[in-house]
Design a protein with these regions (language model features):
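Short, small-residue-biased leader/transition segments that mark boundaries at the very start
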Residues: 1-7
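Vicinal oxygen chelate
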Residues: 18-69, 73-80, 85-121
């Protein structure tokens, strides 16, 4: 998981990210977009889930213009008592031994056929 998440064939904007106050705001936004998706042509891209890197709670949507935007919030507090972890996005490994590979700790799987495609460019 690395270059597969980039826009294919040409440079461009992958997505815009908005930091929310807390997990409640991420889920509230998810519910609102879910309710309005037919009326305003929103499309769920990926989420709700938790990223390995940074541990943010995330939710990705396509706007009516097909650009991808992310709502995310900090998922934890790290200090020197938390051991360092290693994640290799190129080899698609990370997390705890025995975990299924992928770019998130939990949540639905990412659709690599559509994530980062040219619809919103």
């Amino acid at each position: 998981m690395g270059s597969e998440m980039c826009i294919r064939d040409s440079p461009g904007l992958n997505h815009v990210s908005f930091e929310m106050l807390n997990i409640d705001d991420v889920f509230m936004g998810h519910e609102i977009l879910q309710q309005k998706k037919e009326e305003f042509d929103y499309e769920l891209e990926w989420g709700v889930g938790r990223h390995y890197q940074g541990s943010q709670i995330f939710d990705y949507w396509r706007s009516p213009f097909k650009q991808t935007h992310e709502h995310q919030t900090d998922g934890d507090m790290l200090d020197n008592s938390v051991p360092c972890g290693h994640i290799n996005m190129i080899e698609n490994t990370g997390g705890m031994p025995g975990d299924a590979p992928g770019p998130s700790q939990w949540g639905p799987p990412i659709n690599l056929e559509t994530f980062g495609d040219k619809r919103g460019v």
